[in-house]
Every structure is written in structure tokens, then in C-alpha cells.
């Protein structure tokens, strides 16, 4: 099953969330799932945007469905993160995860720490992205292609940007 991986680059959380909302709102029922990846000062925010046909039937299952691969990725890097309604490490909430229904899509947003506590060095985005991508592909049976927003998506995203002063 084809899926899309869209890198938004360096954005503040507000802009990242607004972009994900916009992307989700313009997806059809038959759209391919999308993983949106961003970069912030201390985190790598991400959002899984999936038409409802891919998500579990009950909304209360979406979080674990959407974040299991993130927890597996942390563990691949020997970080003992776990999922308990949120991603935790040593009893501390380390992500700001949300679940939403936007248009025809389930949207599960969260983030990875940029610096893993045991190592206290920045984890390269590329290595983390690749590990996460492989975990998502294995879990869901998807095959990601790097993607740019489509024409309609780009127009919608541009409409959300503040005008230059």
C-alpha cells in the first residue's frame, strides 16, 4: 500500500499543527496515508494522517495504533519508552500526543525527543526518520515515498501562511 512522507522542515508547533490540520482537511477517503515530519528546537514533531478506512474503528484505539511504531523506534535506539495513553520515559511524559478526526482522516500527532536522555547528544533526524519509517511500514504494511504537497494541498497550505509585512 503506497503512503506519503512529507517533510515540512523547521516549524514552530503552531505552524506544524496548522499545516497538519490543513493537509488532513483536504484528503479524500481514498487518499494514501501521510506521515508529516517536522523539526523544532528540541523535538521532531510528526503527525500520521490516515483516511478512516485505515484506522481502527474506535477512536479510543487510534493513539496506540498511531504511536506503537514511535515507541518501537525509541526502543530500537535503546531508549526504554513506553505507551500509557502517552509516550513516557522513566515515568515522564516525553511527547505531546493528540488524536483528532479532521475531515475524512484520523490524525495522530506526537513528537520524538531530539536528544535522547541517556546519550545527551542530538539524534540525527535522518537516522531517526529512517528507523521510524521502517517501523511504520512493518506495522501497517505501507510503503512510503518521500512526497511534496500536491497542488491543492500546497494552495491550502499557502492560504494559512501569514502574509509578509
Segment roles from a protein language model:
Residues 48-52, 70, 98, 110-116, ...:
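Short, structured patches in soluble enzyme cores that scaffold and shape functional sites
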Residues 52-91:
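A contiguous catalytic/ligand-binding core that recognizes phosphate-bearing ligands
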Residues 75, 79-122:
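A contiguous pocket-lining binding segment that forms or flanks enzyme active sites
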Residues 88, 107-109, 113-165:
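C-terminal accessory segment of soluble enzyme catalytic cores
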Residues 1-64, 68, 158:
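N-terminal lobe of the biotin/lipoate ligase/transferase fold
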Amino acid at each position: 500500500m503506497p503512503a506519503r512522507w512529507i517533510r515540512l522542515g523547521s516549524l514552530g508547533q503552531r505552524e506544524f499543527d496548522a499545516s497538519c490540520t490543513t493537509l488532513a482537511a483536504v484528503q479524500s477517503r481514498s487518499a494514501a496515508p501521510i506521515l508529516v515530519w517536522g523539526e523544532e528546537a528540541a523535538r521532531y514533531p510528526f503527525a500520521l494522517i490516515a483516511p478512516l478506512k485505515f484506522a481502527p474503528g474506535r477512536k479510543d484505539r487510534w493513539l496506540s495504533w498511531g504511536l506503537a511504531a514511535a515507541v518501537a523506534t525509541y526502543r530500537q535506539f535503546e531508549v526504554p519508552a513506553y505507551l500509557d495513553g502517552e509516550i513516557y520515559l522513566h515515568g515522564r511524559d516525553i511527547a505531546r500526543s493528540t488524536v483528532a478526526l479532521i475531515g475524512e482522516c484520523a490524525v495522530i500527532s506526537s513528537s520524538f525527543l531530539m536528544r535522547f536522555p541517556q546519550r545527551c547528544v542530538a539524534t540525527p533526524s535522518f537516522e531517526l526518520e529512517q528507523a521510524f519509517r521502517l517501523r511504520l511500514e512493518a506495522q501497517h504494511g505501507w510503503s512510503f515515498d518521500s512526497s511534496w504537497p500536491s497542488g491543492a494541498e500546497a494552495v491550502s497550505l499557502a492560504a494559512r501562511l501569514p502574509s509578509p509585512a
